[in-house]
């Protein structure tokens, strides 16, 4: 035992000293960006900047999280309520196209959400630098700093840019190795209606958000830039800032709007922008830089991943992507994993807005899909990595948004459906619209709020924060209240179902390309989401000792929901009827919600459903849009197939270039739908974590889906439900050592493909008594009489229990 304790102590020291080379966590290039998807993103959640790194002309494209078109508005259609009974009748009669036409006439409105918008850019023009040599630029995601370096003649010029988490401004540091050689002009360009003026030592841009779909532009934004020069002289005019003959220069850039909250735009953009800059300019550059790095690394350094490295890792980043499928650059998977964490830290901090389809980076007035919050998969995917990759605080902006949506969605539920509670359809914006967005084919899906409530419950399972659960419970209850009133008895089956609704962006006859209707009743995803919502609300009700009668009502409704069904192709049915097309490779795999991110399909308790879900995913194919690939990585991880998950990773890491515009990763590692959507980056990061650690199915499963390509490696800092922080080491594609750090204590149940030994370990027996680990009690699936059910082939697992105490660590190793 003494010897084993020494081994554990050595392992603790080994894990604590784990340090991936800084070069492995940099994106670097030997030429400036020429297009936006080559520029490098920096952000502090509120401010975003894309750094092009030009020598003769540098562009710093600017965003502020509250610069949106339009203003406070609603998009409820009061005609919906009267039309609802007839729409339901048409659906139940199988007249889906007629039902969808009625939805279009009575649910749609001219307002489909407002667009996220750019401020514009700050341009830095350097005369005579056009023919620079020895060029280099990078983004160091261990420090959240972008660097540009080059030579003009014998002079070496260097720029550092970061978006300070502490001072809430963008800071640019320019130096040269020869005194008096820094000369440039700074000016703004913007597609907004704007004006530029001088204000003391500052150059100020005042802009206005645009009108959109009849909603006047309510946002006013002010950007201020000030130069601190060392040597030389500075002239500020009404158009630009001119710097001549300086030794070094620091630029401070602030931006702020009049946005207060979704219903209040009475703020003072000038006062806020000025205040940020007043404070920031008092600090020396070195202090500001040090404080920024410390804040960022407090979050980023919690997780370290080492999958090995190779000579290929020395290539420029876009070339690494281009050659990834040759199979030699294993550490690119590490960089991409940590890049997702970097982007989440940079786009979602407490007190701010949630990351939208663009994160916070957008160079347009009309971004793809308006850069809004699409909630039939995309917004949820943005936050899949938050808890498991040890970034729980990045989840909080989404929680605040949910609180606000529960307020606006209450009016939508009453006006459009005559229901209690609150509802959200498939899209929203900064103004928290909750009515139907876009056409009926996409928009007739009232489950957005229900799905998002899963994030409230998962945050509780990972953190054990009962005070948070008490605040979240009214939101969950409100969403449940809506469905308790909205569900209707199916006249044929007797189940309680959603109607009207759809399986996102897909119908039994195809998608929008086939002009097919999507409006149906009780599709599988809806049933799974409502089951998830009711079950989690019921648990929260019991934990908080709330209304027992309400809990009983929830349970009765759970019992009346449809079961999952296995169809004639041995697939998990997408709809109530067995009408799935096995040749469809549609991007949405909505009926697999119960597999991931839900936990309703377990290989150990529901093997037939598990195999049916696998068959459905096989039918959908391995190619997809970027975000869909991100989802499929997670799904194959849940299916315990690491090699198939890695194959999907290979499909994502394909470079978008002129010769291959259908690639899935841009040169700056942004995910490509195409075009850019940030959810694919977050889906990838969550998927890698899911391959290495799972905790949804009654135990912590160690290395559940490790691919052969990652035969040796180490991970530190992943978090399991119940607050168990997990460090692992493996070789030969098998777990060798693990340390568990217990934040909350309680029973720790481990699941492993190899037998383990360690102090306090005992063979697991019976149900896991830790309340943060749950097993869903689902109905027995209905199975088509046309098939012989298939059972999955599963690896043998070993399960152990050990009782833990808060704040203590526990070491185990392979026998």
Cite the ranges covered by each PLM segment.
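Bacterial N-terminal signal peptides that target proteins for export
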Residues: 1-9
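Aromatic-residue-lined binding/catalytic grooves and analogous aromatic/hydrophobic interfacial grooves
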Residues: 23-441, 456-460, 477-480, 531-534, ...
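Alpha-helix capping and helix-loop boundary segments enriched in small/acidic/polar residues
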Residues: 327, 369-373, 386, 436-447, ...
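C-terminal catalytic domain of Rieske-type non-heme iron oxygenases
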Residues: 359, 363, 496-498, 506, ...
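Well-ordered alpha-helical segments within folded domains of soluble proteins
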Residues: 377-387, 446-457, 525-535, 590-599, ...
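Acidic/histidine-rich catalytic neighborhood
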Residues: 478, 482-540
């Amino acid at each position: 035992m003494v010897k084993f304790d020494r081994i554990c102590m050595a392992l603790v020291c080994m894990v604590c000293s784990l340090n991936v080379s800084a070069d492995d966590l940099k994106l670097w290039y030997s030429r400036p960006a020429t297009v936006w998807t080559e520029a490098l993103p920096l952000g502090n959640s509120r401010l975003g900047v894309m750094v092009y790194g030009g020598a003769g002309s540098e562009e710093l494209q600017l965003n502020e999280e509250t610069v949106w078109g339009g203003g406070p508005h609603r998009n409820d259609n009061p005609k919906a309520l009267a039309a609802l009974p007839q729409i339901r009748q048409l659906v139940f009669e199988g007249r889906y196209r007629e039902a969808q036409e009625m939805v279009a006439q009575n649910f749609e409105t001219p307002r489909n959400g407002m667009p996220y918008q750019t401020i514009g850019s700050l341009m830095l023009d350097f005369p005579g630098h056009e023919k620079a040599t020895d060029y280099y630029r990078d983004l160091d995601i261990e420090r959240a700093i972008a660097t540009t370096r080059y030579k003009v003649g014998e002079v070496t010029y260097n720029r550092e840019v970061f978006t300070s988490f502490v001072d809430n401004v963008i800071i640019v540091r320019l130096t040269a190795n020869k005194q008096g050689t820094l000369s440039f002009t700074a000016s703004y360009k913007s597609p907004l209606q704007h004006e530029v003026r001088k204000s003391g030592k500052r150059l100020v841009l005042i802009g206005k958000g645009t009108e959109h779909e009849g909603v006047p532009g309510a946002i006013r934004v002010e950007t201020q830039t000030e130069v601190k020069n060392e040597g030389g002289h500075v002239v500020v005019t009404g158009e630009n800032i001119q710097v001549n003959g300086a030794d070094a220069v620091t630029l401070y850039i602030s931006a702020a709007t009049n946005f207060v909250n979704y219903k209040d735009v009475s703020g003072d953009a000038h006062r806020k922008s000025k205040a940020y800059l007043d404070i920031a300019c008092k600090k020396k550059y070195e202090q500001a830089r040090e404080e920024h790095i410390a804040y960022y690394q407090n979050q980023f350094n919690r997780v370290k991943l080492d999958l090995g490295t190779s000579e290929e890792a020395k290539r420029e980043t876009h070339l690494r992507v281009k050659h990834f499928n040759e199979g030699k650059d294993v550490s690119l998977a590490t960089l991409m994993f940590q890049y997702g964490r970097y982007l989440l830290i940079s786009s979602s901090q407490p007190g701010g807005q949630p990351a939208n389809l663009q994160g916070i980076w957008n160079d347009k007035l009309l971004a793809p899909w308006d850069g809004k919050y699409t909630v039939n998969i995309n917004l949820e995917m943005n936050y899949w990595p938050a808890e498991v990759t040890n970034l729980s605080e990045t989840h909080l902006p989404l929680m605040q948004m949910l609180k606000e949506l529960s307020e606006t969605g209450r009016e939508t539920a009453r006006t459009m459906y005559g229901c209690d509670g609150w509802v959200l359809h498939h899209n929203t914006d900064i103004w928290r619209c909750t009515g139907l967005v876009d056409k009926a084919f996409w928009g007739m899906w009232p489950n957005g709020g229900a799905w998002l409530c899963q994030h409230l419950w998962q945050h509780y399972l990972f953190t054990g924060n009962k005070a948070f659960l008490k605040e979240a419970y009214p939101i969950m209850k409100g969403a449940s209240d809506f469905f308790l009133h909205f569900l209707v008895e199916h006249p044929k089956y007797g189940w309680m179902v959603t109607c009207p609704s759809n399986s996102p962006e897909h119908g039994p006859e195809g998608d929008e390309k086939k002009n097919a209707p999507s409006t149906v009743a009780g599709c599988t995803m809806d049933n799974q989401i409502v089951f998830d919502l009711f079950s989690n609300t019921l648990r929260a009700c019991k934990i908080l000792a709330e209304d027992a009668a309400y809990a009983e009502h929830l349970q009765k409704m759970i019992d009346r929901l449809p079961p999952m069904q296995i169809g004639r192709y041995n697939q998990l049915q997408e709809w109530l009827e067995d009408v799935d097309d096995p040749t469809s490779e549609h991007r949405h795999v909505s009926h697999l919600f119960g597999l991931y991110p839900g936990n309703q399909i377990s290989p150990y308790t529901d093997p037939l459903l598990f195999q049916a879900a696998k068959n459905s995913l096989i039918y959908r194919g391995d190619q997809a849009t970027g975000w869909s690939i991100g989802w499929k990585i997670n799904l194959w991880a849940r299916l315990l197939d690491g090699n198939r998950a890695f194959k999907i990773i290979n499909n994502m890491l394909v470079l978008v270039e002129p010769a291959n515009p259908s690639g899935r990763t841009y040169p700056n590692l942004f995910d490509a739908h195409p075009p850019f959507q940030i959810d694919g980056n977050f889906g990838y990061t969550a998927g890698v974590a899911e391959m290495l650690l799972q905790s949804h199915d009654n135990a912590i499963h160690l290395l559940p889906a490790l691919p052969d390509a990652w035969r040796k490696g180490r991970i530190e800092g992943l978090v399991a439900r119940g607050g168990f922080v997990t460090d692992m080491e493996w070789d030969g594609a098998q777990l060798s050592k693990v340390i568990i750090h217990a934040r909350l204590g309680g029973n720790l149940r481990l699941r492993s493909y190899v037998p383990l030994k360690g102090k306090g370990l005992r063979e697991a027996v019976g149900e896991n008594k830790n309340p943060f680990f749950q097993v869903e009690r689902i109905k027995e699936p209905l199975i088509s009489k046309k098939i012989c059910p298939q059972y999955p082939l599963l690896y043998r697992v070993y399960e152990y229990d050990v009782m833990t105490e808060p704040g203590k660590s526990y070491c185990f190793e392979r026998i």
